[in-house]
Amino acid sequence: MLNEKQVSEKLGNGFSCDFVEVIKINHKEVRPFDLENYSLIFTSVNGVDAFFANGFKPDENFMDKHFNKIYCVGKKTKARLRKYGFGVFKLKKNAKELSEFIVENCAKERFIHFCGNLALDILQKKLPLQNIEYRKVVVYETELLYPKVEHQYDAVAFFSPSGVRSFVQHNLLNFSKIFSIGETTTSEIYKFTDKEVFTGKDNDLAALLQLIKVEGK
């Protein structure tokens, strides 16, 4: 999770920031079931954490006939899977690119997507239309907190579409500059403003901080 020390180290003393809690993550209890013959999809760090918290045990040994391929969105999600001791067969920067890759290259596989209740429905809409077996399993819930921000800031940075929806409930996007961690989050921001949004590459935190350092002066 991003903290003030990370921001200070990356941006230097010329920047100051506050953190506003816009969402709360609650893991759901899901009884583990057999994953045999399924490929697994993770589109967030929270999905990975909730998956393993529920005791699921994927089989990544490709020598086994029914091993599980793992697909994911974002470098942070890949890193979290590594933390649990699992590699990734294919990494894409957003759900749209992952859906396109699956349609073009993996149409005969069966997929289970472990995600939150507010996950975008890109995969759910696209894969079944191509006769690709897809199942969504909600393993965590995202609660929108709808904060009211009284202080005036020069810029704002968003890290998820749900964070955007929570923030705009009681706040205007009347900032000099708006930053976003990736294209999916940027698409959500543009539903509420026509101002330019500075978008980081590949949903990568370091890339976003570098963008803020360059454009936020």
Language-model features: locations:
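Signature of uroporphyrinogen-III synthase
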Residues: 1-217
